[in-house]
Amino acid sequence: MKLETSLTDRDRLKKVGLIFSIGLTIFLFWFILLSYVFAFKRLMLLSWLALKRLIARVARLFLTLFSRDRKISNSEGSFFVRMHKRIYARAVVEFFNALQIKNSQSGIKLLNFFIEKCKRLDASAQIISSTAGMAISLGENKEALRLLSILIERYPSDVSAQQQVGVKAFILGKYKLAEIIWTLCSAHREDLIIKLGLDKLKARFLAPSWYLAIGHIAHLDIYLKHKILNGHVDHKTYFSLPAGMQLPNSNLMSYWSDYISTLDKDTLKNLSPNKIGILQDEFWSIPFEDGKSRMFSHAGSMVQQRWEAEERTPLLNIKPADRLRGEDTLRELGVPANSWFVCLHVREPGFHLKWHKSHPGTRNADIETYLPAARELVARGGYVIRLGDSSMRPLTKEKGIIDYALSKYKSEFMDVFLCGACRFFIGTNSGLGLIPPIFGIPCAMTNWSPIGLPQWYLKDVYIPKLIFSERLSRNLTFEEMLFSEAGWSQFEKYLVKSGLQTIDNTPEEITELVLEMLDKINGEVTLTDNDQKLRKTFNDLVLRADSYIGAQLGMGFLRRHQALLATSTTI
C-alpha cells in the first residue's frame, strides 16, 4: 500500500520520529553505561554501534517519507544530516563523561578512539569539537588545540563549533586556556570575514549565547561600550531570537533598542545562514585591538575602567514613562512617594534547581543573615525590596521590608525598574546583579564566590566567602585562594575533593558592607593611610594572580581579615 502524506502529516511524522529517536538514543545510552559497569564489554560495543546506526537510519527514514510525493529540498536534507550528527555528537560526550568519572584510563582510551575518528575526512564538526572538549577535561590541552586546528581547517565557516571548544574550557574553570582558544577562533574569523568580503557590510549579529540568562543580556552593556570606545558606532548590531528560544527578560532587551536593531527580512535576503553565523558575536569573550580575546569578566573590567576614565555616562536610563508606571507600583507595594529604597537579592537554588542538583554551586546564601542589615536601613528611613522568583523562601512580614519576589506585582517590567531606580543594590553572584550598574546604580555584593572573578564595575563593593581547609585546620589566605582552584571555581565538587569548604559571610559582615555602601553614596567614607595600604596590597595580589580590578573589597571586611593578606608558604 502506497504511503501518502500531506504537509501536516509529514510534520507530524517528523515530530513523532524525533521523539522516538531521542527516546531510543537515551535508552541505548544508559544500556551502554550499564553494560560498562557490569563489564559486558562486547555488549557495550554492539550497543554503541547500534546507537550510531539507529540515528542514521531514522534520518534516512525521514528522507524517504518526504520523498514519496515530492523531491526533498536541500534545506530539509541538511536538517536531517545535522540532526543525526548533533545527536550522535551529544551521545558521544555524555558517554565519555560517564566513563571518565568511573575510570580516567577508560577516558584516555576512548579519547584516543575518537581522535582516530577525527582524522577521517568525513568526521563532522560536532564530533571534532566534542573530542576537543574531551581532551580538555582530561588535561590534554595540546591535543585539544591540535583538534581545534583540524576543526578550523576543515570547517572554517562553523564558527559556533569552534567557539564551543573554548566554552568547554571555561566551564571546567580553565580560563586561560579558554582565552587562548577564543583568541585563535577570533583571529580565524576576522580573516574569514575579510576573505569573504563581509567586512564591507559593517554588521554583526548577536549569537544565541546572549539570550541564555538575564545577566548575559545585561552584559551587552560592556559589548556596546567596547564598540563605542573603539569607534565602531557605524557597525550595526542585529538581534534575532532563534526559534524555540525565550528571552529571560524581554523588557530589559527592549532597553537596548537604541543600540541594537531587530533583524528583518530585508537584511536577511542577501545573507545566507552560513554568513550570518560567521558574523555572530558570542557572549563569552570580546576581541581587543592587541589581538587577544578576553573572557567576559576580564573584558568587562578593561572596558569599564576606560569608560570611567573618560568620564562617560551610563548607556541606559529609566524611561520617563516607565518611571511613572514604576512609581505607581511602588506606592501599591507600600513605598511612599519620594522615599528611597534599596533592592535585595540573595541567590537560592530554586531558580536553577535542576542545574544545582547536578552541579552544586558555591554562590547561594541564606536570606535570614541579611535581615539585620535590612532592619538597619529601615531604621535610617529607607525601604528594602527583596527581589527574586516564586521559588524563594518567604520572608516574615516586617515594617519597611517588602517581599516583592512573592507578590502579585512581580513582573519583568518591575524587575528592571527596581534595579534601575533603587539607591543601591545588595546582592550575591547572580545575573540580576549586573542590571543596576548598567543604569549607573552601585552594588554591595556579598557572599561572593569565586573571589578570582569579582563583579567588574568599579563603583561596586564586595565581600567574598572565605574558604576553610580541613588539612590546614584554618582559613586559606587570599593568596592561597587566588593562586589555586579554590579562588576560581564556583562548583562545590572541586572544593570537596581538596578538603575545602566555603564559609558564608556573617550577619555582622553583611551589615558592615551595606552601611559602608550607604556612607559611600552619602560621601561620608574616609580611608586612613593604613586602609589605603591594605587595599593596595590586596589589589596588587589580585593583579599578580591574573585577576582584575573591578568591585572593591569592603574596607571593614579587609580590616577584619587583614591577617589573610599574609604571604603563604603552602602554594
Show the residue positions of the predicted features:
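N-terminal targeting/anchoring "stem" of glycan-biosynthesis enzymes
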Residues: K2-F40, M44, L51-S67, K71-S106, ...
